[in-house]
Amino acid sequence: MLNTCVILCVDDEAAALALRCLVLSSAGYEVLTAADGAAALEIFRSIQVDLVITDYRLPRLTGTQLAAEMKRLKPAVPIVLFSGLVEEPLGSEHTDLVMTKGMPPVEFLQKVGKLIQK
């Protein structure tokens, strides 16, 4: 079954971004990518996305700063924050879900699916 949902993935680590894109596109999602917060905001403003998945550590803006600005622009779009930290990062109240890096792909896709269905 093909999903018609568009997901914006933001990460400055090319390998992590490529892996996330592979998992999501294999599940039928259309995936857009950005390597930093400024590029992500440009895409977010110009294209309708159904979900944003961002890393916490990004150049120029943190993932939580990016999430806060995105929620200000389009509050209904769910935002997932990826973090290598065990505890939730400061500012994560602007996100709908915090996931730790290294989550198994099946669990990752289940959580993404639940957020998109809301």
Residue map of PLM features:
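Non-catalytic signal-transmission and effector/linker regions of two-component phosphorelay proteins
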Residues: 1-6, 104-118
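Active-site residues of response regulator receiver
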Residues: 55
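Conserved acidic segment of CheY-like receiver
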Residues: 4-15, 20-24, 52
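Short amphipathic alpha-helix used as the core "switch/output" element in two-component signaling
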Residues: 42, 64-75
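Receiver (REC) domain active-site loop signature in two-component systems and cognate sites
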Residues: 58
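Acidic catalytic/metal-coordinating carboxylates
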Residues: 36, 62-65
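Acidic, metal-coordinating helix/loop segments flanking the phosphotransfer/catalytic sites
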Residues: 33-51
